[in-house]
Amino acid sequence: MKNATFYLLDNDTTVDGLSAVEQLVCEIAAERWRSGKRVLIACEDEKQAYRLDEALWARPAESFVPHNLAGEGPRGGAPVEIAWPQKRSSSRRDILISLRTSFADFATAFTEVVDFVPYEDSLKQLARERYKAYRVAGFNLNTATWK
């Protein structure tokens, strides 16, 4: 069964240039990697991808997350790959963490997807539309908050 989890954000605080959603993406990617999963982070654009790349490199050594931008890194990619619409590898991944504002048609290739319901009202409507699209695509839907 395919599962999609939507994390509900209760703030829109920016820290070190990262939105609340982007901060959470880094934490979830780290957690999923530590549990042995290969992760694809699908960014909205190249600028966001580079921002997340820098944030993951800036983590303390004890919480380092091996990652690369799509098309870079070792053969087959690092355990966590950061992509955007114009740049995505075909390397197999266990989990999709989607930062896309619209439903990513390639999401159906994953058995686990992480998405977000941002704090901003204008973005909540887009999240509702993605939620409906995942349901139509046959995903089991869940909502969660981060610890």
From Swiss-Prot:
Its EC number is 2.7.7.7. GO terms for biological process: DNA replication; DNA-templated DNA replication; positive regulation of DNA-templated DNA replication initiation; response to radiation. The DNA polymerase III holoenzyme complex contains at least 10 different subunits organized into 3 functionally essential subassemblies: the Pol III core, the beta sliding clamp processivity factor and the clamp-loading complex. The Pol III core (subunits alpha, epsilon and theta) contains the polymerase and the 3'-5' exonuclease proofreading activities. The polymerase is tethered to the template via the dimeric beta sliding clamp processivity factor. Belongs to the DNA polymerase III chi/HolC chain family. The keyword Oxidoreductase does not apply. InterPro entries: DNA_pol3_chi, PolIII_chi_sf. The keyword Signal does not apply. Gene3D superfamilies: DNA polymerase III subunit chi. It holds the Pfam family DNA_pol3_chi. PANTHER family: DNA POLYMERASE III SUBUNIT CHI (PTHR38767:SF1). This is DNA polymerase III subunit chi. Changing F64A: Cannot complement the AZT sensitivity of the knockout mutant, interacts with SSB, decreased interaction with HolD, no interaction with YoaA. It is an enzyme of class 2 (transferase). Changing E54A: Cannot complement the AZT sensitivity of a knockout mutant. Disruption phenotype: Knockout mutants are sensitive to high levels of chain-terminating nucleoside analog 3' azidothymidine (AZT). Part of the beta sliding clamp loading complex, which hydrolyzes ATP to load the beta clamp onto primed DNA to form the DNA replication pre-initiation complex. DNA polymerase III is a complex, multichain enzyme responsible for most of the replicative synthesis in bacteria. This DNA polymerase also exhibits 3' to 5' exonuclease activity. Genetically identified as involved in the repair of replication forks and tolerance of the chain-terminating nucleoside analog 3' AZT. This subunit may stabilize YoaA and/or stimulate the helicase activity of YoaA. NCBIfam families: PRK05728.1-1. Keywords: DNA replication, DNA-directed DNA polymerase, Nucleotidyltransferase, Transferase. GO terms for molecular function: DNA binding; DNA-directed DNA polymerase activity. Signal peptide: none annotated.
